[in-house]
UniProtKB/Swiss-Prot annotation:
Annotated Polar residues bias: 332-347
Species, as recorded: Dictyostelium discoideum (Social amoeba)
Positions of region (Disordered): 97-231, 316-367
Ranges of biased composition (kind: Basic and acidic residues): 137-150, 159-169
Extent of Low complexity compositional bias: 210-219, 316-328, 348-367
Protein name, as recorded: Uncharacterized protein DDB_G0290803
Superkingdom per UniProt: Eukaryota
Length: 367
């Protein structure tokens, strides 16, 4: 029994007894009749927050004074009345004051514990084990009046327990009523799940409609982009020392040289090595392009445009170079004014270089 911690639990209360080397009990709530009958709790029902230790006669020792059973009973009645009225665990002012006093006197009590422990151990050595086995709650009554007070208190507990049982039965009755109507519950569950399925189908329908709408919008955007390309076809003049006007491209002020590109032309069975003349062309941009064409803007800015013209008798070779890619075109005619024109439809030249609306481009690869 020495240096042992004892715990007692029931459905509403927890009681802790610390080891006997420091025999102080912390009693926080009133506990049931079954708990009172345990042999290692040799004290009567004490209500409130109380600190102390137990004497061999079964009374709670606190400041070397015995707390009378009547006082503890009075506190218990106040507690039970508060439960009946408010339905909550309330502690009266007297017990709160007792708790404060106990906390202030804790050091004094600890000093008394050593002396008490010695006396307690002496009593245990004098056949206390046999006494504890045969003891009962009645053995601790010091008088008939005290026993009567206990029976009255016990009856109070029984009355309150009956009230609690009635309350529990009412709760069980409500549960039984619910069990007698399973169809209503099943009907509610069915309606709830049906509503969930309807909501899920509605969400799927909305998602499909949104996808269709996005596809239609994308198709319209593609058509607008294609139409925009056709309207931005090449139209302008290319002069030997002039300006090149381009529409539908996303770069401007582009200059380029076709340096040291040699073109071999056979004319009248004579091999002649002709060096192209370099020109600088100013590019004027009409920034009217589609969104997806703008993705190639950075790549287009690295391209160069060079227009070179070589006149050999009546034969002109026009070369367009893009990133060292050379395209030779022969048998193109040039007039005396030095203005070269190219018709994309029949590869003939006369005057201005004008393309039809059917040809369009958005990058230098189309030139």
């Amino acid at each position: 029994m020495k240096n042992k911690i004892s715990y007692l639990n029931d459905d509403r209360h927890t009681i802790k007894r610390v080891k006997r080397s420091n025999p102080i009990l912390f009693i926080k709530t009133p506990y049931s009749r079954e708990a009172m009958k345990k042999k290692y709790f040799k004290f009567y029902l004490i209500h409130g927050f109380t600190t102390g230790y137990i004497s061999r006669s079964g009374t709670l020792e606190n400041k070397k004074k015995n707390l009378s059973f009547k006082k503890s009973k009075k506190n218990l009645n106040s507690y039970l009345n508060s439960l009946n009225k408010d339905g909550a665990d309330q502690v009266n002012d007297e017990n709160v004051q007792n708790e404060e006093n106990d906390e202030n006197q804790e050091n004094d009590e600890n000093q008394e514990n050593d002396e008490y422990e010695e006396n307690y151990d002496d009593e245990e050595n004098q056949g206390n084990d046999e006494y504890e086995e045969n003891e009962s709650v009645e053995n601790h009554f010091e008088s008939d009046s005290e026993k009567g007070d206990f029976e009255e208190m016990d009856q109070t507990w029984k009355t309150n327990e009956k009230d609690n049982e009635k309350s529990d039965n009412n709760d069980n009755g409500d549960e039984n009523n619910e069990k007698t109507k399973p169809n209503q519950q099943l009907q509610f569950i069915g309606l709830h799940r049906k509503k969930e399925n309807q909501d899920e189908d509605s969400n799927k329908t909305k998602e499909i409609e949104q996808q269709q709408q996005n596809q239609k919008q994308q198709q319209v955007n593609d058509e607008d982009c294609s139409s925009n390309k056709q309207s931005n076809s090449f139209s302008g003049n290319v002069l030997a020392f002039g300006n090149m006007i381009l529409k539908g491209l996303s770069f401007s002020d582009l200059t380029g040289n076709n340096n040291n590109n040699n073109i071999n032309n056979n004319n009248n069975n004579n091999n002649k090595n002709n060096t192209n003349t370099n020109y600088t062309n100013n590019v004027v941009v009409n920034d009217n392009i589609c969104e997806k064409d703008k993705e190639n803007t950075q790549d287009q800015q690295t391209n160069t445009v060079t227009v070179s013209t070589t006149i050999i008798n009546t034969t002109t070779t026009s070369t367009t170079s893009e990133n060292s890619n050379t395209i030779d075109k022969s048998n193109d005619s040039i007039n005396e004014s030095g203005i070269s024109s190219l018709d994309e439809s029949n590869n003939s030249t006369s005057g201005d270089l004008i393309s039809s609306n059917s040809s369009s481009f958005s990058s230098m690869d189309d030139i």
